[in-house]
Design a protein with these regions (language model features):
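Bilobed "Venus flytrap"/periplasmic-binding protein-like clamshell domains
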Residues: 25, 29-49, 112-171, 175-177, ...
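A local structural motif
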Residues: 52-63, 146-159, 294-300
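Hydrophobic residues within well-ordered alpha-helices
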Residues: 72-76, 164-165, 224, 288
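Secondary-structure end/capping motifs
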Residues: 217-287
């Protein structure tokens, strides 16, 4: 079940130096959507709480699970000006969206995991039926690269571990905070797909990023992209403050675990993918297309 929340970020203050905006001018609304997870909350902290303001713009934030955001981005011209997406979804929305150069969640030799109630070999994964968090998630794409044609059942990401414990599935593909909490439930890690990806390609695993609507135009796209980067930098520079805010979204994590999770997915690479990070996005989508998982080739386009 998806969970959607909306709250305003009134980033509309006009600086005294900006004489181009009159006192009566209405700020331009920019709609932003991201997942209700501690890492996303951390990176958007600056914008969501007005620590980062952009003259002439007002940001409103919608929170929803990543598979729902993937689907909404595919709806017509897309539901939001800026949206978090799984990289697997990008080829389906590339006509209307470009990728922002910051805001990515990238695993450095780690990533989504296959877990189960009992241990079994990596080689036997192909013969299992796996609970997955959505068919547009990057986790699902990488699972199919590892085990082509594997049988799966779509389950809301936050229900995968409970359903494994109830015996409804042989194994589950976990994302988000589940990567740190699965052992509390007595589950075994069968495979870390981020580690497999790094061993196979030598690259980090790009899981998700932020896409921006092309119809905003180059100037506004760049301005919004700079605001997001400033928000991430603010959170990194004011870590304790931003972590305290992010804790309200940290499902089942104590402050120490939330700090660890945020550190895994919000770091210097979140500010800038780097050459190898951008190459990893291209390689991932190329491999998905070549394997027949993605029906058409991706034209990876970063703003700047």
């Amino acid at each position: 079940m998806s969970s959607t929340r909306t709250f305003p970020g009134e980033s509309s203050a006009v600086s005294s130096a900006d004489s181009s905006l009159s006192a009566s001018a209405q700020p331009r609304e920019i709609t932003i959507a991201h997942s209700p997870d501690s890492d996303d909350a951390f990176m958007f902290y600056g914008l969501a709480t007005n620590k980062v303001r952009v003259p002439g713009l007002r940001f409103t934030h919608t929170l929803s699970d990543i598979e729902t955001l993937n689907r909404k981005a595919m709806d017509g011209n897309g539901a939001y000006d800026v949206t978090a997406i799984s990289f697997h979804a990008y080829p389906y929305i590339q006509e209307h969206y470009a990728l922002l150069p910051s805001g990515g969640s990238v695993g450095e030799g780690y990533g989504p995991m296959i877990v189960a109630k009992r241990a079994f070999s990596e080689e036997s994964i192909q013969r299992k039926r796996i609970a997955i968090p959505g068919k547009l998630t990057t986790a699902y794409l990488v699972l199919n690269l590892f085990a082509p044609g594997i049988e799966t059942d779509v389950v809301p990401f936050d229900q995968i571990i409970p359903e494994l414990l109830e015996g409804k599935h042989e194994a589950g593909l976990i994302i988000h905070e589940g990567q740190l909490t699965y052992t509390r439930s007595g589950l075994y890690r069968v495979l870390d797909l981020g580690a497999w990806w790094h061993k196979t390609t030598g690259l980090p695993l790009p899981l998700g990023g932020n896409a921006i609507r092309r119809s905003l135009g180059p100037e506004l796209m760049a301005k919004v992209g700079a605001a997001l980067r400033e928000s991430i930098q603010y959170a990194l520079d004011h870590r304790e403050e931003a972590l305290n805010y992010a804790m309200q979204f940290a499902r089942d994590l104590d402050s120490r675990s939330a700090d660890k999770f945020v550190g895994m997915y919000v770091n210097q690479r979140t500010l800038d993918y780097g050459t190898d990070g951008r190459e990893a996005v291209r390689r991932l989508l190329e491999m998905g297309h070549e394997a027949g998982i993605i029906p058409h080739a991706a034209q990876v386009d970063f703003v700047g």
